[in-house]
C-alpha cells in the first residue's frame, strides 16, 4: 500500500481534474479491490451520512456536490452508483471517488450502478474516453474489473436500504441479497441485474421494464419489502428527477439524482440526502457548477435514458 502522502497527492491532482497515469490507476484499483472484497452485498453504514445518486462523469458537478455537502472525510458519503458514462470526465470522476475510498475507507461507501459494467460502458462513453485519454483500453479494464467488487446495496442503521435501481421478484429479504455472488459482470437478467436496473411504478405488482432489464415494482411491493425487512425507506437513484429528489409510493421509496443539468441539457436540479445522527432527513439541492470548456469527443454517445 502506498503511503497516505502519495494518495493525498493523487487526490489533490484529481481534484484539479487532472487524470492519474496508467500505472497509478492500476495500483489504485488493486488497492480498492483489496478493500471492497471485504465489504458485503448489503454493506452496513452508520449515520450521519450523505446519500448521493448518479454522477455520470460530470466532474465539476461532483466538486460542487462536495462544496455543498462538505468534503470527505469531514462528511461521510454513500454513493449509489453510475459514476461513469454520459459526462465528459468519467475517468477523473471515478478515479477521484475510488481514491477517496482507498484513503478514507470507513467514510465513503460506493455502490455499483448499472453503468458500472463492461457492456454498458462500451456503448455510453467510458470506454471511448479511456481510449482517448490513455491511448489504449488498459485503464478501462482496470476500472471495469474493479466494478465487479463494488457492493450492490447498503443499509443505514438497519433502517434505510440504499441501492442503485430497485427491487427484484427473486429477492424478498436482505438475507436473499446477502447470499448472491456479486463478483461478476452484471448479468442480463436475474436478481443482481434487477437490483441495478429496476424502477418504482404507479401500477401495483411487478411489471415489465421499458429499459429491457429489471422490472417495475408497485407501492404494494415496496411496502411489503420494507415491512418484511424492518425498513423505514428505500433510497435509490437510476432515474432523472427534475428537482433532484422525488418521493414516491407513499414515502416508502425516494429517488435521489445528483447530476444537475443531466447530459448538459436536461435542465434538472441535483440533490443529495443528508441523514443525521438521529436519522433525520434533509435534502440539499444544487444547480450545475459553472460550465467549463468542453473537451473534444471522438463520437457522440447515443441518446437514451438508462
UniProtKB/Swiss-Prot annotation:
Post-translational changes noted in the entry: Reversibly methyl esterified on Leu-306 by leucine carboxyl methyltransferase 1 (LCMT1) and pectin methylesterase 1 (PME1). Carboxyl methylation influences the affinity of the catalytic subunit for the different regulatory subunits, thereby modulating the PP2A holoenzyme's substrate specificity, enzyme activity and cellular localization.
EC number: 3.1.3.16
Active site: 115
A GO MF term: protein serine/threonine phosphatase activity
Binding site residues for Mn(2+) 2: 82, 114, 164, 238
Positions with a binding annotation for Mn(2+) 1: 54, 56, 82
Keyword Manganese carried by entry: yes
Manganese listed as a keyword: yes
CDD domains reported for this sequence: MPP_PP2A_PP4_PP6
Gene Ontology cellular component terms for the protein in this record: cytosol; nucleus
Predominant localisation class: cytoplasm
Keyword terms of this UniProt record: Cytoplasm, Hydrolase, Manganese, Metal-binding, Methylation, Phosphoprotein, Protein phosphatase
Catalytic activity: O-phospho-L-seryl-[protein] + H2O = L-seryl-[protein] + phosphate; O-phospho-L-threonyl-[protein] + H2O = L-threonyl-[protein] + phosphate
Leucine methyl ester PTM positions: 306
Subcellular location field: Cytoplasm
Pfam families membership: Metallophos
Cofactor remark from the record: Binds 2 manganese ions per subunit.
Necessary cofactors: Mn(2+)
SMART domains: PP2Ac
EC supergroup of this enzyme: hydrolase
Subunit structure: PP2A consists of a common heterodimeric core enzyme, composed of a 36 kDa catalytic subunit (subunit C) and a 65 kDa constant regulatory subunit (subunit A), that associates with a variety of regulatory subunits such as subunits B (the R2/B/PR55/B55, R3/B''/PR72/PR130/PR59 and R5/B'/B56 families). Interacts with TAF12B. Interacts with SRK2E/OST1. Interacts with TAP46.
Family: Belongs to the PPP phosphatase family. PP-2A subfamily.
Listed name of the protein: Serine/threonine-protein phosphatase PP2A-1 catalytic subunit
Amino acid at each position: 500500500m502506498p503511503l497516505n502522502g502519495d494518495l493525498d497527492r493523487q487526490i489533490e491532482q484529481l481534484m484539479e481534474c487532472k487524470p492519474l497515469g496508467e500505472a497509478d490507476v492500476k495500483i489504485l484499483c488493486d488497492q480498492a479491490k483489496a478493500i471492497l472484497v471485504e465489504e458485503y452485498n448489503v454493506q452496513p453504514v452508520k449515520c450521519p451520512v450523505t446519500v448521493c445518486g448518479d454522477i455520470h462523469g460530470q466532474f465539476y458537478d461532483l466538486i460542487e456536490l462536495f462544496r455543498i455537502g462538505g468534503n470527505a472525510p469531514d462528511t461521510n458519503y454513500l454513493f449509489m452508483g453510475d459514476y461513469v458514462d454520459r459526462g465528459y470526465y468519467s475517468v477523473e470522476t471515478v478515479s477521484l471517488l475510488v481514491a477517496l475510498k482507498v484513503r478514507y475507507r470507513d467514510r465513503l461507501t460506493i455502490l455499483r450502478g448499472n453503468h458500472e459494467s463492461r457492456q454498458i460502458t462500451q456503448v455510453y462513453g467510458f470506454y471511448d474516453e479511456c481510449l482517448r485519454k490513455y491511448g489504449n483500453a488498459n485503464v478501462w479494464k482496470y476500472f471495469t474489473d474493479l466494478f465487479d467488487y463494488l457492493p450492490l446495496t447498503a443499509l443505514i442503521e438497519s433502517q434505510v436500504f440504499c441501492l442503485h435501481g430497485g427491487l427484484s421478484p427473486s429477492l424478498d429479504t436482505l438475507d436473499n441479497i446477502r447470499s448472491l455472488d456479486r463478483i461478476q459482470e452484471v448479468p442480463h437478467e436475474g436478481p443482481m441485474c434487477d437490483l441495478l436496473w429496476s424502477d418504482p411504478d404507479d401500477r401495483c405488482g411487478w411489471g415489465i421494464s421499458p429499459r429491457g432489464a429489471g422490472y417495475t415494482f408497485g407501492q404494494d411491493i415496496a411496502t411489503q419489502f420494507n415491512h418484511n425487512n424492518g425498513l423505514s425507506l428505500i433510497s435509490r437513484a437510476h432515474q432523472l428527477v427534475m428537482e433532484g429528489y422525488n418521493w414516491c409510493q407513499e414515502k416508502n421509496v425516494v429517488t435521489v439524482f445528483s447530476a444537475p443539468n443531466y447530459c448538459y441539457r436536461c435542465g434538472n436540479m441535483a440533490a443529495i440526502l443528508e441523514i443525521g445522527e438521529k436519522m433525520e432527513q434533509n435534502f440539499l439541492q444544487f444547480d450545475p457548477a459553472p460550465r467549463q470548456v468542453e473537451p473534444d469527443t471522438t463520437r457522440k454517445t447515443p441518446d437514451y435514458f438508462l
